[in-house]
């Protein structure tokens, strides 16, 4: 059943225009899964059109009420959102962390001076280096003339 589900999911992704993404497991934790920055940008841009998505990914914790009335709380692993973290940045509004084997990835929505930047950092060497890598990009944005134009 999972194989049939994954086949249909991959067909759906292809039909939606995510032509360079292939998933082998519903969890996404398969080292053979493939995607590209282009597909990550496309799906993120599409989801960011939804306010409910922005609300969820910008929080360090999110509690959902399930159909049976019970609740489930998720803790966001993006330490840019954690006010107790050395990496906390009030201008980061999500989006997704991910890691497989020795690759640490991070997709970030950064808001500064009324502008939004979608940053996809793939293949960092450690959990902390993914935040250092993105911080370097954020610093470059902050110091550029682009924000004053």
Predicted stretch roles:
Residues 1-149:
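Penicillin-recognizing serine hydrolase domain
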